[in-house]
Amino acid sequence: MHNRWHLYNELIDSVPSTELVKSFVYGDHWLMVESDAGGVGIAQHFPAMPGAQDPALSQYEIMGQPLRKVAERLKSWDFNQASIGLAALNAANNTLALRPESPIQPGVNRLPGNAFDFFRAEATGKKVAVIGHFPGLRMLRQHCDMCILERNPQPGDLPDAAAEYVLPEQDIVFVTGTTFINKTITRLLELTRTAKVFMVGPSTPMHPLLFRHGFASLSGLVVENAAGVARALKNNDCEAIFANGGLKVNLLPGGAQ
């Protein structure tokens, strides 16, 4: 029987066993984990589930803990704990300064402006699905046949249950790192085997092993100034993440193209 956790286990195993959690920052929409090796990762989080622990209190549990052990929370069904796990995973991988020898180094392109604009030429004239309703899709939508799948649909969106029917017909599919948190990523990859799958957003794990699982591109965040990004998260200013030390990056198979 296929192990549904295989991709998760591979990512968690990629986290160095020697690194520890140095700091934890919790905002209204995003959280941040910093390792004692200098790596920083962020992830989106969600309203606490009924009866679940307040995720803001997790700092008292994870400070000084092995980064890999905290990354194991990515498999939790408490989605806020899973967000903490994803941020820990990203702290190990989404960094240029910490691992200059990493495959991430030659594969990174700086992405000015809207990340979706980077894919405009690729998407022109194609059937495109986006998992989740995001700002900045207006320009891209003018160049392709786009459908948006959303758990809480806005006018013109499709409900997320439509994925089983529409994703196998798409040329390009955009997903975010939150699909790791809510455990939909495994099924989404099964439904998109004939499409190009791009993972986008600050929660994206920038690890090349994802290319073996069907991803064509990874667009995420590298934190160059931990203090600046921490201030933005505490002030609940998502746009300020990118103005205060968050660098948009893109990783392609085999390096920059």
Q: What does each model-found stretch correspond to?
A:
Residues 84-87, 93-94, 127-166, 176:
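Conserved mixed alpha/beta catalytic, RNA-binding, or beta-rich assembly cores of soluble enzyme
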Residues 163, 179-213:
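Feature captures the catalytic cores and cofactor-binding loops of soluble hydro-lyases/lyases
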